[in-house]
Amino acid sequence: MTEKALRLGTRRSKLAMAQSGQVADAVSQVTGRPVELVEITTYGDTSREHLAQIGGTGVFVAALRDALLRGEVDFAVHSLKDLPTAQHEGLVVAAIPEREDPRDVVVARDARKLTDLPRGARVGTGAPRRMAQLNAYARTHGMEIETVPIRGNVDTRIGYVRSGELDAVVLAAAGLNRVGRIDEVTDFLSVDTVLPAPGQGALAVECAADNASLIAALAELDDPFTRAAVTAERSLLAALEAGCSAPVGALADLLADGQTVKEMRLRGVVGTTDGSTLVQLSTTGPVPETHEAALALGGELAAEMLAQGAAGLMGERAQ
């Protein structure tokens, strides 16, 4: 007798379906049970407003979480950068698989890199974080660009470049990789140029907190280094009281001595979207061995950033 299928709640977008499909295959291998994808439409998918206008935080996950709490699905897959930093009562992030490339990338006309864009180039992005850092980079390198707010899926965003409406768009490398379009990238942006969003490139697999057997099975997919890194990044975001649409970038990476991981470096940035002012700091310490240690690393760096005026650069802080 075939075991009952596990139901995986996912957004309907091509990217969400691709990443949910990868997780479904992994869960099926671990549990020996089939996994059925259950498509759910979220408010963030149907609204055409910019993320900053609709509140940003949680707009892509609320419907998935409601389905989990109602028992309509057994687990859900989120892009971690879309997940609110506060723990949701009754739910648990049972797995954070190994992270994909966290960098941002450029898809530009005529195969141009960021530094090769024509004077006055129109560069599309949906993220105030990217706008702040791209405009700051342009200011310090004698470039003239116009950052243009855009929404839409990968096809829509790249379509603006193909149609000539924009000279370039900036997207997450991980998303393009998951939908098989990484070969369209014309420039991989160094994290020294643009720090990614907290949790960018990582997935969160969430289920009911009282489903002990499923939590144990999903834990097989968890990558402890990725979890420590994104916990520190998201702790910084939470301590800044910033939502996922705020102009905040963060990246924790591991510093190795040969084959041995020695330390974790956490970098954070917050800035005005016109790029006129950035607060960018970093800290390095032992690799956090507990959830609390990772939280502390992010909180400490956030406190330093706030002491240097970060709060005044974010506009409206998350409520």
From Swiss-Prot:
Catalytic activity annotation: 4 porphobilinogen + H2O = hydroxymethylbilane + 4 NH4(+)
UniProt keyword annotations, A-Z: Porphyrin biosynthesis, Transferase
Signal peptide, first to last residue: none
Residues modified to S-(dipyrrolylmethanemethyl)cysteine: C244
Source species, domain of life: Bacteria
Cofactors: dipyrromethane
Pathway the protein acts in: Porphyrin-containing compound metabolism; protoporphyrin-IX biosynthesis; coproporphyrinogen-III from 5-aminolevulinate: step 2/4
Catalytic class of the enzyme: transferase
Function (record text): Tetrapolymerization of the monopyrrole PBG into the hydroxymethylbilane pre-uroporphyrinogen in several discrete steps.
BP-aspect Gene Ontology terms: heme biosynthetic process; protoporphyrinogen IX biosynthetic process
Extra facts: The porphobilinogen subunits are added to the dipyrromethane group.
PROSITE patterns recorded: PORPHOBILINOGEN_DEAM
Summary of subunit composition and partner proteins: Monomer.
Originating species: Streptomyces coelicolor (strain ATCC BAA-471 / A3(2) / M145)
Family assignment from sequence similarity: Belongs to the HMBS family.
Entry GO MF terms: hydroxymethylbilane synthase activity
GO cellular component: cytoplasm
Keyword field contains Transferase: yes
Protein name, as recorded: Porphobilinogen deaminase 1
Note on how the cofactor is bound: Binds 1 dipyrromethane group covalently.
HAMAP family per UniProt: Porphobil_deam
EC code: 2.5.1.61
UniProt keyword Transferase present: yes
InterPro entries: HemC, Porphobilin_deaminase_cofac_BS, Porphobilin_deaminase_N, Porphobilinogen_deaminase_C, Porphobilinogen_deaminase_C_sf
